Amino acid sequence: LKNYFKFEKVELINDFAVLIYGIPYLKSNQFKTLQNNTNKNNDFEGYHAIVGAGTGLGISRGIISKTKIFVLPSEGGHIEFAPKTLEEWELKQWLKNYLNIERVSYERVISGEGLSNIAKWKFSKEDIRDHPFKHYLEEAKESNIIKKNLAGKICQLAKEGDPLMAEIEKLWFNAYSSFIGDLAVHELCLGGLWISGGTAPKHFKNFISD
């Protein structure tokens, strides 16, 4: 890259860690506040954490001062999934068998693929023959394009009022919001806890609900 573009210096960094560098440059219309922030002056100084579910589950931390930004990359999305309900425990056991793994990370549940996994689990335990999504699951076995769009289809059907898809989406969101709460306690990020990723705008109303 350095030679091809004739740059003086090239530095490669984690794709999620780079988001920390962008925080000080955000304008007020580029983010929404979910809870009253501790940064009353909007100077963005302090310790920050970013979490985002999308293709995977990304996490990054950083310290922003008046003169410098220190970025602390993380692979926290690979922390082991800790079920908080019987339903989540059953999901975890199913994922172990379905994926043939001993350890289930949060990313297996809280991501686009994770949402699809929850749907597959639901359909494996319930006799639902005529639901349109079941046919979509079958088609996904033969098409990577359809497979990649499973999460989007779930959200679409849930938005259209499908009760089963809404239930699946709610289980996913409950796991995600619980993880975010744990992250806030773990990191004590008084500068700000930021929710990023492709799923954040789609679930904004859920994030601000009681």
Residue spans for each PLM region:
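ATP-binding/phosphotransfer module of carbohydrate and carboxylate kinases, centering on a glycine-rich
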Residues: E90-D210
